[in-house]
Amino acid sequence: AAAAGAVLPVALDIDVSVAFPGIYFGVYRSSLRQAADLRALLAILPDCPALKLCGVMTYEAQIAGVTDAHNGKNGAYNALVRLLKRRSLPHIRAWRQEITQILQASGVELAFFNGGGTGSLASTLADAAVTELTFGSGLFAPALFDGYQDFQPRPAAGFALEIVRRPRADVYTCLGGGYMASGSSGRDKLPLLMYPRGRLLANEGAGEVQTPFRFSGSLDWPQDNFALFRHAKAGELCERFNELLLLDNGTIAGRAKTYRGDGQCFL
């Protein structure tokens, strides 16, 4: 920036994870974890005239991205997560308030103070320090977000696979389908079969080449030659398909290109 004679606006990504005895509740996102870290960084900013601090990001992943009412988890696990969330929120709010005070004392005027994610919109909205809310996956309301106690989103996206084989009377095999969500591995990262109301096979799951499922009900195959799924998280559809079909009352009302369709690969 200095070589180009420009001033580059920058934002700080500040860690708002909470460490409990024996449990690190959050993500390893930033080295700015406490007041001393932030003050040390602010102290060197005057030596960087080509940089202008304009924003702060404080993503509370442990609230926004961790399910607490998931059917695939036992009751004790869900109860523990809800307890940790409740105990995390006061720490997060206090730390954000301290961040605000430190920045004000340093004469920094922010354009935005960012926080939030799909699973934490309500709690972040109530945080006075935050001026900008972020949510991404919530636009699609994918399957992982069925597992939250505080909100129930309405599914807004999914995908269809062609059923190409019937290797057993109650087993149907789709072409492709291995569209897995990111993050820690587990069955909750698999696509969720919506139609017909069957279940994936434990030994195969959703595969790059094929996705078999078991269904003992009535299916007029090969006339009924498709299965409908919901993806688990957010990026799977835009990574795998060139465009999304926009449906309105059962009819195709338009088409929207994904970043794959635009020839983009960001990460």
Residue ranges and their predicted role:
Residues 118-122, 139-141, 147, 170-171, ...:
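Short, catalytically relevant binding-site loops at active-site mouths
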Residues 166-267:
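C-terminal accessory subdomain/extension
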Residues 104-105, 109-113, 160, 168, ...:
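Substrate-binding and catalytic surfaces of secreted/luminal carbohydrate-active proteins
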Residues 1-6:
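Active-site-adjacent beta->alpha loops and helix N-cap segments on the catalytic face
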Residues 153-160:
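Short coil-to-beta-strand transition motifs
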Residues 7, 16-141:
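Active-site loop/helix belt of alpha/beta enzymes
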